[in-house]
């Protein structure tokens, strides 16, 4: 059942915002008003479409009492009634609580798990998969930290991804990704299983998270290249430790000033993510509105090379086009995960 009082409140708020922006009072707040107005517009459009449909149905029902108009009404009413469920579903979707982080840029972190060199190679495959997907979306990917292995794998990669709805599209990628394949170093042709962990964090702004300078320990050290050799002769790498949580962030570009900026950016994102997780836990002990448990240690997906298969275990989705997926063709997976999360939210709201 759609709450009519809420529809009225949203419409009245939208009209107020429209009038406030037209008046131009309080110029400092115009940006905030415009943002809220923009967020409400698609909701109000769905409300208008739904209310128009109800109004048309009411008019058609009245026409049944007019002998001249009754044939037209009898033809129109079934069409209007058949359109009603779709309009209700679209409106319910528009009314779902919005994650304010959805429009934010994101930090992507990938680290190998069990599996040694093969896990590091798989971590590299995953990073390239996300890079290719970002290209298809027109997003910008900036590398923050990259530690490679001698075989071309990745020990750790941290990247900043900026563009439209980055976090909304990538947030369900967090978790353990498992690969089953024959390693190139395996002479016996045996299939090995290894894993890598992906974390996608929304970028945090100062308004999102406050960090007390007294809670930080900042160390400088020599940057190291492959094999551990020093890549310059000055102390440029920066390590920041957040003492209350024990979180440690490092950055090792050539500029110490830039390293400090990058490390703080990553630290803010991780602390913001911790706070979001804490709030989510308080709101829903069973995390019913999330895809999976939301736990980064949860195995979310398996990439089976011998079968050319990708399976997402949270929604039991299996695709037999692994090559395309690893080339960045992720929309079908992401759309299915998003739809599943929305369906869970709707069910949760209906309880």
UniProtKB/Swiss-Prot annotation:
Alphabetized SMART domains for the sequence: PCRF (SM00937)
PANTHER family recorded: LD18447P (PTHR43804:SF7)
Compartments (UniProt record): Cytoplasm
SUPFAM superfamilies the record matches: Release factor (SSF75620)
InterPro entries recorded: PCRF (IPR005139), Pep_chain_release_fac_I (IPR000352), Pep_chain_release_fac_I_sf (IPR045853), Prokaryotic/Mito_RF (IPR050057), RF-1 (IPR004373)
Classification via Gene3D superfamilies: 3.30.160.20, 3.30.70.1660, 6.10.140.1950
Molecular function via GO: translation release factor activity, codon specific
Modified sites of kind N5-methylglutamine: 229
GO cellular component: cytoplasm
Protein's job: Peptide chain release factor 1 directs the termination of translation in response to the peptide chain termination codons UAG and UAA.
Record keyword Transmembrane helix present: no
Record PTM: Methylated by PrmC. Methylation increases the termination efficiency of RF1.
Species for this entry: Roseobacter denitrificans (strain ATCC 33942 / OCh 114)
Family classification: Belongs to the prokaryotic/mitochondrial release factor family.
Region of interest: Disordered: 278-297
Keywords: Cytoplasm, Methylation, Protein biosynthesis
Source taxon at top rank: Bacteria
Descriptive protein name: Peptide chain release factor 1
Major location (coarse): cytoplasm
Regions annotated as coiled coil: none
């Amino acid at each position: 059942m759609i709450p009519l009082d809420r529809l009225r409140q949203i419409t009245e708020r939208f009209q107020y915002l429209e009038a406030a922006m037209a008046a131009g009072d309080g110029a400092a707040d115009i940006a905030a008003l415009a943002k809220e107005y923009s967020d409400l517009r698609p909701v109000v459009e769905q409300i208008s479409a739904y209310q128009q449909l109800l109004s048309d149905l009411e008019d058609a029902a009245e026409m049944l009492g007019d002998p001249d108009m009754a044939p037209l009404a009898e033809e129109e009413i079934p069409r209007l009634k058949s359109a009603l469920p779709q309009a209700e579903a679209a409106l319910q979707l528009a009314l779902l609580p919005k994650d304010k982080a959805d429009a934010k840029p994101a930090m992507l972190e990938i680290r190998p798990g069990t599996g040694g060199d093969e896990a590091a190679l798989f971590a590299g495959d995953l990073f390239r998969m996300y890079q290719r997907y970002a290209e298809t979306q027109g997003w910008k990917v900036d590398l923050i930290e990259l530690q490679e292995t001698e075989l071309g794998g990745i020990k750790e990669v941290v990247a900043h991804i900026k563009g439209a709805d980055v976090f909304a599209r990538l947030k369900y990628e967090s978790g353990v990704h498992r690969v089953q394949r024959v390693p190139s170093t395996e002479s016996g042709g045996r299939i090995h299983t290894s894993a890598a962990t992906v974390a996608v964090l929304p970028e945090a702004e100062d308004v999102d998270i406050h960090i007390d300078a007294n809670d930080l320990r900042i160390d400088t050290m020599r940057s190291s290249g492959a094999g551990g050799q020093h890549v310059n002769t000055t102390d440029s790498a920066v390590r920041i430790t957040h003492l209350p949580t024990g979180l440690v962030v490092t950055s090792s570009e050539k500029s110490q000033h830039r390293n400090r900026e990058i490390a703080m950016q990553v630290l803010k994102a991780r602390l913001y993510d911790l706070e979001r997780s804490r709030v989510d836990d308080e709101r829903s002990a069973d995390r019913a509105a999330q895809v999976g448990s939301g736990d980064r240690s949860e195995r979310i997906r398996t990439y089976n090379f011998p079968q050319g298969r990708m399976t997402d275990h949270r929604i039991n989705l299996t695709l037999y086009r692994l090559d395309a997926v690893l080339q960045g063709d992720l929309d079908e997976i992401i759309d299915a995960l998003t739809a599943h999360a929305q369906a869970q939210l709707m069910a949760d709201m209906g309880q």
